[in-house]
């Protein structure tokens, strides 16, 4: 048990979006060691098919299993929407997604709920289903925002065009007089300064990163897996260019992370993917 307690928590996303979850882990679980993986060679996930996402997630989880993680947080709403329920039973460590914690937080704040997310997450209706399962009276409006992740990954957050895009995506939600807005993609917290210029202060902003980490903390405590000594330095790995990831991420981490490039194992049975494609799509 001692060795498992010392194992890292795995966190993955398509890119820098999951750093919002990582920073929250630093805040709520400062004594835990972390392993962060960004699938930058294949981002953005939001325009991928369900079968592609499932394949990518399985490859990442197999690799993380090889790194002896004790828990994995899918710091990616698209993965959480399209793959979490399928892969949870395939691995012997807990896997947490961001959608259910975000939905629970949203229904505590209001009943007219807007969700901004990737197109794939919006198409899945994962947030609407989760929110209305908790509160059937809640009204939910979803907008798939195809341009946000590429703009963030290109470090164009302060580009005037990004604000124009934000107006385009948020206007339909504001027209519905929403009282709550959910960041349905972990990348979007990086755009908070822009959103706060557009969204009235009466609208509650929900960042699921805060709540999935709280859930992870509770689960570690229940399983007796909390680490109570100083952690190892966070390990960063990517499937794409390490230097690009490090350069972009340092503005949110406060330091230039040493990042390694890794090759993920191919683990997919093509016939199984075809079968699950019918389920996911």
Swiss-Prot record:
**Enzymatic class:** isomerase
Q: InterPro entries given for it?
A: Asp/Glu/hydantoin_racemase, Asp/Glu_race, Asp/Glu_racemase_AS_1, Asp/Glu_racemase_AS_2, Glu_race
**Gene3D superfamilies the UniProt entry points to:** 3.40.50.1860
Q: Name one Pfam family in it.
A: Asp_Glu_race
Kindly state which keywords UniProt assigns to this record, in alphabetical order. Answer: Cell shape, Cell wall biogenesis/degradation, Isomerase, Peptidoglycan synthesis
- For this protein, the Enzyme Commission number is 5.1.1.3
Indicate which residues the UniProt annotation says bind substrate: 13-14, 45-46, 77-78, 186-187
Gene Ontology terms describing biological process: cell wall organization; peptidoglycan biosynthetic process; regulation of cell shape
The reactions it catalyses are: L-glutamate = D-glutamate
From which domain of life does this come? Bacteria
* Pathway given in the UniProt record: Cell wall biogenesis; peptidoglycan biosynthesis
Q: Where is the active site?
A: 76, 185
Which GO MF term does the entry hold, naming one? glutamate racemase activity
| NCBIfam families the UniProt entry points to | glut_race
Q: What does this protein do?
A: Provides the (R)-glutamate required for cell wall biosynthesis.
Stated family: Belongs to the aspartate/glutamate racemases family.
Q: What is this protein called?
A: Glutamate racemase
* Gene assigned in the entry: murI
